């Protein structure tokens, strides 16, 4: 469809409207509960309330999808469906506000659905133990955070670092510095991980009632809270010093046997360094990776699970501990994440710093980098050569078409480097591929409005043909007078010429070109490529016809040719017998002879080009028989199917290269914009030929050539600018009809689905809760009009809404029966809106709704 659509003048017919009803195999379960829509009905500004609505809706949606996935009576994974209140299912919600002083902040919301695996009937008390386990962790965290808040308010001190630990074992809290304790945490975590501990959770005292789930005797539970406060020089708006606060909460395993730790069957002292030179590289790497993963998992996972567990209760709970936890988390959310990342990166830096001293590890990294670098060497050289080529060779302004010979020279120039070295062959190939892409992009720029692609292609074809023709003439020594002649077409009019040859052996029947066997219309390929090829042939035949006439064309013959040249995609312009070729007079001056010779050059060029590319076949006419045949009857050529264009591969002579080039141009796929430019250029060519005729076209047409004769479709404005304002009524009408026929045919072909593919259904489902009935009806009518303009056969509406579909169904049936167009429907809608606005301005009430009014007045 054209980019510029005149909706009010569109002549496209309206489509039908139907109610979408799914088949038996497609049950329709489109339901939206009122509770789910409450978010849209009640525009609350409280983010916590909105998030609680969203959580409930997600829970219901997830439960609904699970019910659909497992139908009643079926088993899911070999077990019966659990009820909605099963404690093994749970939703974890995490949302916090990052609002800070001086910035609006952002609200973060995360939700995850978790289903615990079924553990059998022997673990009935696991849910209770799990609640106590997380409650114990939560209590420790809340107590530590509340203690921090109280101490902060009482003391008011700053620049302090507090390290609080809750020990569940028998050992007293060690009196050590914070950095030493942090380093020991990492060392002990790596040591504990290497002992293949079976449990993945840290059970506290009283966490598990079952004896099988008790913790090993050599492990104890440790909960650590680290609080940092850093004072900055700036002062806040309330004259209080601003401080950055962060806390770090961690729960890890600790070994009771702090003195010894068995590893790999050996006994090593616990105070040994984690990285020893005598350790094997594989054990060293495995212990490092396990330590990092255990450290990150114990810090991040345990803390976030505790937070999400708490926030699940916080939606409906208003206890003091929950409120304090909420305030603390929202206040310190950024500091928590920042401190976690900082701590992890510091430990990772220490690990990598030690790894860089290991020669085996460094050599492995170097080998890996070298392997990846060698694989990317071709791409790197490709980019370098492409850049070098663009700097050296691509400085000229891009042309639409380049010479094929120029392309091959550029490729060989760059690819000759290092041809003898077998290692550089793939690099040369990559550079050639890169150049091909660059040249392809350069050779197909966006066509400028003042010069279309077809005009540039025609100029290039004429220049190439003249060059080849002069080379052949110079070799044979036939025409020496044309060596210094200009390669431009004279602009002034030619005098009428008598009927004998133009200075070269020519027979009138040669103009018609070898006659092809006409094919049936259903065998032709009606696509954009065939349209473009036929338009090119039409343009070339029009130029050839004008050259043969010598500037004196019969007006009636031109009108017949213009009216029938482009109405069908597989036929060329009509060439009547009355408008056959004419010849120059004998004894003309040298200037006229030179012009006639130049005209003969162009004529022979186009004739040979068409015969060797478009009309070439096995049963073409013999040249000798053509010369001997003096029959005046000349039939118009018929363009063959585009599938026969491959027969031009065996051409010879001076036009072999030109034939191959034009065939390659015609065989490429052309887009819709290219076809539009072709049609525009052919129409302009017809007008130029019409204006250059000696006989005025005004004698055949009427005096009315205003805007009323223009069709109402999207016709190019440039073509209207070429049309004369005086005395070209008939020519303008015929050209417009021809262009309109092509435009309509292309639209009808593009709207049809491919063979063997059913057209997809277009289904519209509108959900407007707070809108008025008037706006709903207007929206449905505009959707119907847009679907009609896009050639949608039937528009389906799903879900009845206040009887709008029934009225629209009746309206569409009446409009299709009356033959109404899209423009007429839109004009009626505008009329109704104007009347409604006038009634509202006066104070009257509109009696009829939009659909009812259209039923009466459309």
Swiss-Prot record:
Segments for region (Disordered): 191-244, 570-590, 620-644
GO MF annotation list: protein kinase A binding
Modified residues (Phosphoserine): 215, 410, 641
Domain of life: Eukaryota
Region feature PKA-RII subunit binding domain, mapped onto this chain: 131-144
Residues recorded as bearing Phosphotyrosine in the entry: 411
One of the GO biological process terms: establishment of protein localization
Disulfide bonds: none
Post-translational modification summary for this protein: Phosphorylated by STK33 during sperm flagella assembly. Phosphorylated on tyrosine.
Listed Pfam families: AKAP_110 (PF05716)
Main subcellular location: cytoplasm
PANTHER family: A KINASE ANCHOR PROTEIN, A-KINASE ANCHOR PROTEIN 3
Record family assignment: Belongs to the AKAP110 family.
Annotated function: Structural component of sperm fibrous sheath. Required for the formation of the subcellular structure of the sperm flagellum, sperm motility and male fertility.
Domain comment quoted from the record: RII-binding site, predicted to form an amphipathic helix, could participate in protein-protein interactions with a complementary surface on the R-subunit dimer.
Record-given protein name: A-kinase anchor protein 3
Naturally occurring in which organism (per UniProt): Bos taurus
């Amino acid at each position: 469809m054209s980019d510029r659509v005149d909706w009010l003048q569109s002549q496209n017919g309206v489509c039908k409207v139907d109610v979408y009803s799914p088949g038996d195999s497609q049950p329709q379960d489109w339901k939206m509960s009122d509770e789910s829509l409450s978010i849209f009905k009640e525009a609350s500004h409280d983010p916590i309330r909105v998030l609680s609505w969203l959580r409930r809706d997600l829970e219901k949606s997830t439960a609904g999808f699970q019910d659909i996935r497992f139908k009643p009576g079926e088993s899911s994974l070999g077990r019966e469906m659990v009820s909605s209140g099963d404690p093994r299912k749970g939703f974890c919600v995490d949302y916090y506000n990052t609002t800070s002083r001086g910035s609006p902040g952002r609200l973060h919301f995360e939700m995850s659905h978790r289903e615990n695996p079924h553990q059998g009937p022997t673990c009935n008390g696991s849910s209770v133990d799990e609640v106590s386990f997380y409650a114990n962790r939560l209590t420790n965290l809340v107590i530590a955070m509340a203690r921090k808040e109280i101490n902060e308010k009482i003391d008011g001190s700053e620049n302090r670092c507090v390290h609080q630990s809750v020990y569940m074992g028998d050992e007293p809290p060690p009196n050590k510095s914070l950095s030493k304790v942090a380093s020991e945490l990492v060392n002990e975590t790596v040591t504990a991980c290497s002992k293949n501990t079976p449990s993945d959770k840290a059970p506290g005292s009283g966490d598990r009632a079952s004896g099988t789930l008790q913790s090993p005797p050599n492990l104890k539970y440790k909960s650590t809270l680290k609080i940092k406060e850093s004072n900055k020089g700036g002062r806040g708006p309330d004259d209080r010093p601003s401080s950055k606060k962060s806390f770090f909460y961690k729960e890890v395993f600790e070994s009771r046997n702090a003195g010894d730790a068995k590893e790999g069957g050996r006994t090593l002292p616990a105070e040994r360094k984690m990285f020893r030179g005598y350790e094997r590289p594989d054990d060293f790497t495995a212990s490092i990776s396990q330590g990092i993963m255990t450290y990150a998992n114990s810090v991040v996972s345990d803390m976030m699970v505790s937070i999400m567990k708490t926030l699940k209760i916080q939606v409906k709970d208003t206890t003091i501990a929950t409120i304090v936890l909420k305030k603390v988390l929202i206040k310190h959310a950024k500091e928590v994440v920042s401190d976690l990342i900082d701590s992890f990166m510091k430990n990772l830096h220490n690990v990598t710093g030690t790894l860089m001293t290991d020669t085996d590890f460094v050599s492995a990294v170097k080998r890996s980098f070298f392997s990846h670098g060698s694989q990317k060497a071709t791409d790197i050289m490709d980019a370098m050569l492409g850049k070098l080529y663009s700097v050296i060779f691509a400085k000229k302004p891009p042309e639409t078409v380049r010479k094929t010979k120029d392309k091959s020279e550029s490729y060989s120039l760059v690819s000759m480097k290092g041809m003898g070295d077998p290692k550089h062959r793939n690099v040369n190939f990559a550079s050639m591929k890169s150049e091909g892409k660059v040249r392809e992009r350069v050779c197909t720029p966006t066509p400028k409005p003042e010069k279309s692609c077809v005009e540039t292609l025609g100029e290039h074809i004429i220049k190439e043909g003249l060059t080849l023709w002069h080379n052949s003439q110079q070799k044979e020594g036939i025409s020496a007078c044309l060596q210094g002649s200009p390669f431009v077409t004279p602009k002034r009019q030619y005098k009428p010429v008598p009927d004998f040859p133009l200075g070269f052996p020519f027979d009138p029947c040669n103009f018609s070109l070898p006659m092809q066997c006409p094919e049936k219309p259903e065998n032709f390929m009606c696509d954009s490529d065939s349209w473009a090829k036929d338009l090119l042939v039409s343009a070339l035949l029009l130029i050839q016809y004008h050259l043969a006439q010598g500037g004196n064309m019969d007006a009636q013959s031109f009108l017949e040719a213009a009216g029938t040249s482009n109405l069908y995609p597989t036929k060329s312009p009509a060439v009547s017998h009355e408008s056959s070729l004419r010849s120059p007079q004998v004894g003309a001056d040298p200037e006229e002879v030179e012009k006639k010779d130049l005209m003969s050059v162009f004529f022979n060029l186009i004739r040979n080009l068409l015969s060797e590319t478009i009309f070439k076949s096995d049963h073409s006419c013999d040249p000798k028989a053509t010369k001997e045949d003096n029959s005046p009857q000349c039939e118009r050529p018929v363009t063959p199917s585009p599938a026969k264009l491959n027969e031009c591969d065996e051409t010879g002579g001076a036009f072999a290269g030109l034939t191959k080039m034009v065939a390659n141009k015609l065989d490429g796929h052309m887009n819709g914009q290219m076809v539009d430019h072709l049609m525009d250029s052919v129409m302009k060519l017809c007008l130029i030929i019409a204006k250059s005729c000696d006989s005025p076209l005004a004698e055949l047409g009427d005096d009315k050539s205003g805007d009323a004769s223009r069709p109402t479709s999207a016709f190019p404005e440039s073509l209207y600018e070429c049309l004369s304002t005086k005395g070209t009524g008939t020519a303008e009408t015929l050209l417009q009809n021809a262009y309109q026929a092509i435009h309509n045919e292309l639209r009808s072909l593009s709207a049809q689905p491919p063979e063997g593919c059913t057209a997809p259904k277009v289904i519209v489902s509108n959900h407007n809760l707070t809108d008025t009935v008037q706006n709903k009806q207007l929206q449905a009518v505009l959707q119907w009009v847009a679907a009609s303009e896009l050639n949608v056969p039937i528009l389906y509406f799903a879900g009845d809404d206040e009887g709008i579909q029934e009225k629209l169904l009746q309206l569409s049936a009446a409009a299709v029966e009356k033959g109404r167009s899209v423009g007429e429907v839109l004009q009626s809608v505008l009329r109704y809106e104007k009347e409604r606005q006038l009634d509202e301005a006066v104070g009257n009430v509109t009696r009829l709704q939009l659909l009812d009014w259209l039923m009466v007045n459309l």
